[in-house]
Amino acid sequence: MIKKIAILTSGGDSPGMNNAIRAIIKTARLYDIETYLVYEGFLGLYNGWIKPSEGIDEDSYINKGGTFIFSARFVEFAQEKYRQVAKENLLKLGIEALVVIGGDGSYKGAQKLHEMGIKTIALPGTIDNDITSSDFTIGYDTALNTIVEAVDKIRDTASSHKRCIMVEVMGHGASDLALYSGMATGSEIIVSNDYKLSVEEMAKIVKKQFEKPNKRSVIITVSEFVFKDLQQVAKQIEELTNITTKAVVLAHIQRGGYPSARERINATILGKHAVLRLKQGQSGIALGLIKNQVAATPILEALAMPQTRKDLLERRTKSYNDINQA
């Protein structure tokens, strides 16, 4: 039976990670399993920055964003010699199992440790929602709400000055944040990696929108990486329409903030089940939520899945562009 479990968060932080950590600690305590915290992700695992969770008030982090055990990117972990040191650091403390919370890069690290004999469970922690072995990743719902709040405020000032404003959101190739924030805010144009429009096409729509009586604002929601220079695109739209057009890149504000209620619930469920699966002797699996049920997928299979639900997102983006422009 598992006696000791370590927890680490890796890659980009996301709201809800603290809730997952809390659930792991509490569920493990229920079964007399000791938990250890690995500080600063795989970098900390390599450097031996591992401490018992005893004395930590995990409840105090339930409403905090980010990750209280911190995160880091450590590309050297792809090399076996670094992973071997990390494994030895776990074994020296008698730690038999590890829960890794992060995105696809974190999943790759978790899989390698599983292959080296460490019992490993991966949980999807990223705002991008690009781990498709789960309907929702930890951090996505909060980021979506953050974007909606920001765009609502941007709409206020755009309406005051009769402007078009382009808003770039994160997603790292996945279009979920752009599409669903665009739906929620009534963005007149949604452009993503799954549904692209040219500058001329956008300008035509903007011009038509402002021909409506009393129309005061147009919001264009754009996924990151669609355009290399959003300021330049905004300038081109302004030149084609004679409508003042600004560009706003929301950037890292999307990764911060207190987790939403749904986030806390999802993260708690996944954290609890990570312990239960390890207790059952399972390893090398990624947990997620599919149709509100906990689903387990081998990490290798999860990594092989497309990072975007392209066909669905493309259809929905076109459909809701049509609706929002009506």
UniProtKB/Swiss-Prot annotation:
Family: Belongs to the phosphofructokinase type A (PFKA) family. ATP-dependent PFK group I subfamily. Prokaryotic clade 'B1' sub-subfamily.
Gene label: pfkA
A molecular function GO annotation: metal ion binding
Record-given protein name: ATP-dependent 6-phosphofructokinase
Binding, substrate: 126-128, 163, 170-172, 224, 246, 252-255
Entries under SUPFAM superfamilies matching the protein: Phosphofructokinase
Binding site for ADP: 22-26, 155, 186-188, 212, 215-217
Lineage: Bacteria, Bacillati, Mycoplasmatota, Mycoplasmoidales, Metamycoplasmataceae
Function field: Catalyzes the phosphorylation of D-fructose 6-phosphate to fructose 1,6-bisphosphate by ATP, the first committing step of glycolysis.
Active site: 128 (proton acceptor)
InterPro entries named among the record's database cross-references: ATP_PFK (IPR022953), ATP_PFK_prok-type (IPR012003), PFKA_ATP_prok (IPR012828), Phosphofructokinase_CS (IPR015912), Phosphofructokinase_dom (IPR000023), PKF_sf (IPR035966)
Cofactor: Mg(2+)
Protein keywords: Allosteric enzyme, ATP-binding, Cytoplasm, Glycolysis, Kinase, Magnesium, Metal-binding, Nucleotide-binding, Transferase
Location relative to the cell: Cytoplasm
Catalytic activity from the UniProt record: beta-D-fructose 6-phosphate + ATP = beta-D-fructose 1,6-bisphosphate + ADP + H(+)
GO CC aspect terms: 6-phosphofructokinase complex
Positions contributing to ATP binding: 12, 73-74, 103-106
EC number in record: 2.7.1.11
Pathway linked to the protein: Carbohydrate degradation; glycolysis; D-glyceraldehyde 3-phosphate and glycerone phosphate from D-glucose: step 3/4
Quaternary structure note: Homotetramer.
Residues binding Mg(2+): 104
Regulation: Allosterically activated by ADP and other diphosphonucleosides, and allosterically inhibited by phosphoenolpyruvate.
GO biological process: one example: fructose 6-phosphate metabolic process
